[in-house]
C-alpha cells in the first residue's frame, strides 16, 4: 500500500505532540539523520534576509522661505493648532511617527510643495 504525501501529512496532523516527537525520533534512528537545523549553516550566510521597513518617521528639517505655507501644510498633516504648528515649523522636528510608506511619502510631498525640507526615516 502506497500513501500519498497528503495522506501522510493528514495522518501526522491527527497525532498528539508526544506522538509526533516519537515519530521524529524513530525517523532519526531509522535514517541516521538529525531533525535539528545545522547551526553553522544558518549563521554562515551573509545574505541574511533584510526585513523591509514598514513604519516610517517623517521629520521636518527646514521650513524654507515660505513659512506661512509650511505652517498651513503642517496643520493639515498633523491636526495641530496654529501656535503648535508654528512652533514645530520654526524648530523643526517629528511630524509623524509610525506612518506607512504611502502616508509618509504623501506628507513629504505636501510639505515639499509648500517649500519645506522633509526627511523620511
Curated annotation (Swiss-Prot):
Record's subunit section: Homodimer. Part of the ribosomal stalk of the 50S ribosomal subunit. Forms a multimeric L10(L12)X complex, where L10 forms an elongated spine to which 2 to 4 L12 dimers bind in a sequential fashion. Binds GTP-bound translation factors.
InterPro entries in the record: Ribosomal_bL12, Ribosomal_bL12_C, Ribosomal_bL12_C/ClpS-like, Ribosomal_bL12_oligo, Ribosomal_bL12_oligo_N_sf
Keywords carried by this UniProt record: Ribonucleoprotein, Ribosomal protein
Protein name: Large ribosomal subunit protein bL12
Keyword match Ribonucleoprotein: yes
Record's GO cellular component terms: cytosolic large ribosomal subunit
Family: Belongs to the bacterial ribosomal protein bL12 family.
GO biological process: translation
Coiled coil as UniProt keyword: no
Amino acid at each position: 500500500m502506497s500513501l500519498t504525501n497528503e495522506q501522510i501529512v493528514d495522518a501526522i496532523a491527527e497525532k498528539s505532540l508526544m506522538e509526533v516527537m516519537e515519530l521524529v525520533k524513530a525517523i532519526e534512528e531509522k535514517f541516521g539523520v538529525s531533525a535539528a537545523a545545522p547551526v553553522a549553516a544558518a549563521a554562515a550566510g551573509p545574505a541574511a534576509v533584510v526585513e523591509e521597513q514598514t513604519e516610517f518617521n517623517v521629520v521636518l528639517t527646514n521650513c524654507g522661505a515660505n513659512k506661512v505655507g509650511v505652517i498651513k501644510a503642517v496643520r493639515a498633516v498633523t491636526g495641530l493648532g496654529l501656535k503648535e504648528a508654528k512652533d514645530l515649523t520654526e524648530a523643526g522636528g517629528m511630524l509623524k511617527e509610525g506612518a506607512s510608506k504611502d502616508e509618509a511619502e504623501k506628507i513629504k510631498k505636501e510639505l515639499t510643495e509648500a517649500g519645506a525640507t522633509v526627511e523620511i526615516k
